[in-house]
Amino acid sequence: MTSTLDLDKGCTVEELLRGCIEAFDDSGKVRDPQLVRMFLMMHPWYIPSSQLASKLLHFYQQSRKDNSNSLQMKTCHLVRYWISAFPAEFDLNPELAEQIKELKALLDQEGNRRHSSLIDIESVPTYKWKRQVTQRNPVEQKKRKMSLLFDHLEPMELAEHLTYLEYRSFCKILFQDYHSFVTHGCTVDNPVLERFISLFNSVSQWVQLMILSKPTATQRALVITHFVHVAERLLQLQNFNTLMAVVGGLSHSSISRLKETHSHVSPDTIKLWEGLTELVTATGNYSNYRRRLAACVGFRFPILGVHLKDLVALQLALPDWLDPGRTRLNGAKMRQLFCILEELAMVTSLRPPVQANPDLLSLLTVSLDQYQTEDELYQLSLQREPRSKSSPTSPTSCTPPPRPPVLEEWTSVAKPKLDQALVAEHIEKMVESVFRNFDVDGDGHISQEEFQIIRGNFPYLSAFGDLDQNQDGCISREEMISYFLRSSSVLGGRMGFVHNFQESNSLRPVACRHCKALILGIYKQGLKCRACGVNCHKQCKERLSVECRRRAQSVSLEGSAPSPSPTHTHHRAFSFSLPRPGRRSSRPPEIREEEVQSVEDGVFDIHL
């Protein structure tokens, strides 16, 4: 690094820019390429590229006033380096490209042909393909057979084509996509990264589907063996990302529970499987994987999820700026971010050592394009080997390796403490929903008849008199809110919002019911209630103010209220479930896995 800059103490953008200019000599040779590349790659984290271009123009004009021809030349060398190292920025950012063209026009106007010749903005190739997201096939095409490709490919050939598919998708990811993800914590307005994550999940799901598509345990064991060898070949190709996807599919609960199937897998295959699983386990912050990646030479495909997790951890741990005025950027953080992003950027500069067949790629793309939920996969697993089936007792049987925390939670986020304002907000929303749906005559009160209807859905609700404080024969909104506020301390403030959450890997993007942002299944950020199916982020779990409406216990209120017109009859279906205020445990009731149902996106709406 340039000796005049102390990144650990922080520096201004202008100081860094000046240091990058001074890193060049008059002939264009870079004395400190690491500093220059780091700043040009990382500056969008702090200021827009168009603003950096304006600063460069200002530096050039200032050096012209100072009659510093050397500084002018170095500035032009920096612009040339910027265009050469990051051409996609100039093709995909019209405002930035226009500013550089203005600088070049100024040089031409002043007769500085030598300086102008260094800036070749017109020769930048198009990178529009990096912003084009492959559209998935229509839903009606999903149910075709998946064995067309699988049965005819050797493990290495399949590993090579999977590598090519993911590499092609990965090359479309730009710095701005990483920055957006780390900033928002999700893939809002980030279709390229979202599509790559979807492809990762598709591979993991396809592995499960291929295994579960076989009717006999022996056949399923052969498929498992085949995929273990595919994973072995992926490791040989140093493709850790797809290796993670395949191992994740093999270690999924829908596969790991197949005891009879695993009894037909050879001990050697089990041993190989265990070794591959151990390589990508989250133990020690993925220490095994990191050591193996660091030793790689040539092409390697890192596990994107691990490195995105590192970026998120840095973003949470360290500030971007060291002063309240946001003038001195955190150079230490910038250096650490650069190391992670440079490792990812290196992937696109090294082509994988594979030759892909276009026809096979098309078949594989169709095979991966499936829409199966976690519940559907598990139900298929139960069909293959029901729970009542006794496990084999053969002395030669092998058990699958324990499912590792392959991709653990991103960061340890402390659960927010529930204050009274938040509890009141939750309760008010719940009570408003109760009145909207159960106040049949719309008089703003719950009568005894209406209360009995509610009790059908709220089995733990206290007696009518406990809520009717003034004993006037009906319950007002204020009385119901007061009742739940009194009871909330027993249940930790969660009341009717107790859900039976489990981690969810949704192939399709789904929205969090609290913050409305998208949930990415690949990184286990999402939770899904096994009773009502509501989705939310882990960090939104404690703030979710949506009742748990168990579909299996829905109540029909047909004909419970007079119809407003003779031609319209109201049908109301509800599935609410509230705990009894006196209960000390806030744990939701256990739900058998047979009761888990596939949930469509709009299932939580009240149908009137």
Swiss-Prot record:
Region named Disordered: 382-405, 555-596
Annotated positions binding Ca(2+) 2: 468, 470, 472, 474, 479
InterPro entries: C1-like_sf, EF-hand-dom_pair, EF_Hand_1_Ca_BS, EF_hand_dom, PE/DAG-bd, Ras-like_GEF, Ras-like_Gua-exchang_fac_N, Ras_GEF_dom_sf
Binding site for Ca(2+) 1: 439, 441, 443, 445, 450
Residues bearing the modification Phosphoserine: 116-117, 147, 554, 575
Domain Ras-GEF: 154-387
SMART domains named among the record's database cross-references: C1, EFh, RasGEF, RasGEFN
Membrane topology reported for the UniProt record: Peripheral membrane protein
Phenotypic effect of disruption: Mice have a combination of defects in leukocytes and platelet functions which are reminiscent of the human leukocyte adhesion deficiency type III syndrome (LAD3). They display bleeding diathesis due to a defect in platelet aggregation and are resistant to collagen-induced thrombosis. In parallel, they also display impaired response to acute inflammation associated with defects in beta-1 and beta-2 integrin-mediated adhesion of neutrophils.
Domain notes: The N-terminal Ras-GEF domain mediates association with F-actin.
Name used for this protein in its record: RAS guanyl-releasing protein 2
